[in-house]
Amino acid sequence: MAHSRARRRKRASATQLYQTCKLTGTCPPDVIPKVEHNTIADQILKWGSLGVFFGGLGIGTGSGTGGRTGYVPLQTSAKPSITSGPMARPPVVVEPVAPSDPSIVSLIEESAIINAGAPEIVPPAHGGFTITSSETTTPAILDVSVTSHTTTSIFRNPVFTEPSVTQPQPPVEANGHILISAPTVTSHPIEEIPLDTFVVSSSDSGPTSSTPVPGTAPRPRVGLYSRALHQVQVTDPAFLSTPQRLITYDNPVYEGEDVSVQFSHDSIHNAPDEAFMDIIRLHRPAIASRRGLVRYSRIGQRGSMHTRSGKHIGARIHYFYDISPIAQAAEEIEMHPLVAAQDDTFDIYAESFEPGINPTQHPVTNISDTYLTSTPNTVTQPWGNTTVPLSLPNDLFLQSGPDITFPTAPMGTPFSPVTPALPTGPVFITGSGFYLHPAWYFARKRRKRIPLFFSDVAA
């Protein structure tokens, strides 16, 4: 027995369900958004329309009506038909043209002729004219007189010019026949413009020179006494000449004590001076004054720690050695003049004006001893004798007289060189190779002097 299939009943549409279930609140979840146009597609169009305008295309979820203007049928426009026939000309208004002046310009134009002094032409009258004649008794004789020519020369002095006249007038000379003149030249008044002061000086007296005085910049100070440096005083004098002896053993090849010194220690070692332990670098020396002392300073770098990259980490130490104190003098020494106060003349032939001595006689000078005795040449007050030491060799003598003749030593035997023992003939050297003398193998190099200041030390 065949079973009859149950008839399927059509489900109500969303609009019908919305009308019955909206009030009771039993609508399926997809009915209300579809009827109220609140689906995801509607929300996309709603929020996208804020930034995009499609005009009147009518894009939406409603019926496809083509928007407010409807659809335009897609058909080609018909071509306009061209009919053959006579073409009528448009009416043209013809304006009358009047004749104008000719455009031809004559190249030859008559000039106006003015006859000054000619008799005026009187037009004839209709009634005719009358001719009047008279006899002339005065003969036509011209008065011929002798013509005299006058020449005038004018010379200007370029040296002299009147100061008050800016543009002098040309000279004017006149006589009975010639007159030379020129228009008057007037000078314009000079406009005075006050000068503006651009440089403002604070001093009342004003600047004394146009070139400013350059300021003296302070000299940079080396930070030898900062907190980052450890101060160590050295008492060994070898620190001045060979500081490497205080750190490592003496190296005879080393030269130059005024440069930076570097040391490399491969193993643990003891320095000759404990103050220079683990020193890997000594910077250049510097000489300065500190509290009345002349101080010789060097900056040292310790290598207490070594990293794998080869970098050394350590403290910086300031080594200094006081050379000598700068003390003031304990007492002041008065300077005395080297020349005596009296103006004495040490002349062995000076005349004496003392009483009891004949002025025509010369003073007696005893030269048997090694001293000469002289009397000063004074008039007002006698002074004591001045003894001048004079040493005379045994082979020299003095000759009396107004002049002193210096003795001459006898000439000795002329020197004659000894004949050399080497052969005097020509010397020939034959050979293909030569050797340099051992003294020239190592030529001493000139050491470059470097100023004593820290060029590689941070201040």
From Swiss-Prot:
Which terms in the GO cellular component ontology are assigned?
Answer: host cell; host cell endosome; host cell Golgi apparatus; host cell nucleus; viral capsid
List the GO biological process terms. Answer: microtubule-dependent intracellular transport of viral material towards nucleus; symbiont entry into host cell; viral penetration into host nucleus
Cysteine-cysteine disulfides: 21-27
Q: Which ranges belong to the motif Nuclear localization signal?
A: 1-12, 442-450
**Cell compartment(s), UniProt:** Virion; Host nucleus; Host early endosome; Host Golgi apparatus
Q: Identify the domain of life.
A: Viruses
Post-translational modification comment from the UniProt entry: Highly phosphorylated.
Q: Which GO terms describe its molecular function?
A: DNA binding; structural molecule activity
Name of one Pfam family that matches: Late_protein_L2
Q: How does it assemble?
A: Interacts with major capsid protein L1. Interacts with E2; this interaction inhibits E2 transcriptional activity but not the DNA replication function E2. Interacts with host GADD45GIP1. Interacts with host HSPA8; this interaction is required for L2 nuclear translocation. Interacts with host importins KPNB2 and KPNB3. Forms a complex with importin alpha2-beta1 heterodimers via interaction with the importin alpha2 adapter. Interacts with host DYNLT1; this interaction is essential for virus intracellular transport during entry.
Give the protein's function.
Minor protein of the capsid that localizes along the inner surface of the virion, within the central cavities beneath the L1 pentamers. Plays a role in capsid stabilization through interaction with the major capsid protein L1. Once the virion enters the host cell, L2 escorts the genomic DNA into the nucleus by promoting escape from the endosomal compartments and traffic through the host Golgi network.
Give the record's family classification: Belongs to the papillomaviridae L2 protein family.
Q: What is this protein called?
A: Minor capsid protein L2
Source organism per UniProt: Human papillomavirus type 6b
What is the taxonomic lineage of the source species?
Viruses, Monodnaviria, Shotokuvirae, Cossaviricota, Papovaviricetes
